[in-house]
């Protein structure tokens, strides 16, 4: 089994959801970002999404757009992001790590080389928001052939006709974007989320993780009662944006992660 399959299976046995944390690689700089990345599992992150900085992150809200700008100004690129994964894997061979971003940097890097290097570095999955299933042959299929999961986004506007196409070839987990719009936007109602999870379960046996708009341990706990995973990004990144120094950024992200983790772990008790 892959790291993602193993982790979600373990958590299912424990009757709890996964806390999935998102941070942008290289934000606010390489060393601080690596310290945050290495600290997340001990702070309670079950799965980590690591953003690949890009100049035009059109699906992301202001917090993550600014994180991309900070990382790019600190000279972060895909080579350094993969190096960060290698550094992380020196100390951690259990926590699933998913790279999230856009196709352009991967295309520039070269798809075959990227897949080979990502696999060697210890990447478990990819979320590439601008690669629709109609283009599975370009990245999804070769990634999965190499043993890297390809995780799809679904939204409130993905209807029952479109869903099988979107889920075709997806693996690892399904990422349900609970608000139609950009990341970090307001949270959806729990009734809406519950209906969406029920609908998705009719179409897939994959774990369902829900993100966008989750900022507090209470919100995380509410989602953890309904879904297999709770994704938090913008709320963590705000601690980096608002920190007056690097140590404050590290401490802020990891303390919120710990609080969110407690919310998720106690949600079904």
UniProtKB/Swiss-Prot annotation:
GO terms for cellular component: cytosol. InterPro entries: Aldolase_TIM (IPR013785), RibuloseP-bd_barrel (IPR011060), Trp_synthase_alpha_AS (IPR018204), Trp_synthase_suA (IPR002028). GO terms for molecular function: tryptophan synthase activity. PROSITE patterns: TRP_SYNTHASE_ALPHA. The active site is at 49 (proton acceptor), 60 (proton acceptor). The keyword Amino-acid biosynthesis applies. Its EC number is 4.2.1.20. Keywords: Amino-acid biosynthesis, Aromatic amino acid biosynthesis, Lyase, Tryptophan biosynthesis. It is an enzyme of class 4 (lyase). It catalyses: (1S,2R)-1-C-(indol-3-yl)glycerol 3-phosphate + L-serine = D-glyceraldehyde 3-phosphate + L-tryptophan + H2O. Pathway: Amino-acid biosynthesis; L-tryptophan biosynthesis; L-tryptophan from chorismate: step 5/5. Pfam families: Trp_syntA (PF00290). The alpha subunit is responsible for the aldol cleavage of indoleglycerol phosphate to indole and glyceraldehyde 3-phosphate. Belongs to the TrpA family. Tetramer of two alpha and two beta chains. This is Tryptophan synthase alpha chain. It comes from Pseudomonas fluorescens (strain SBW25).
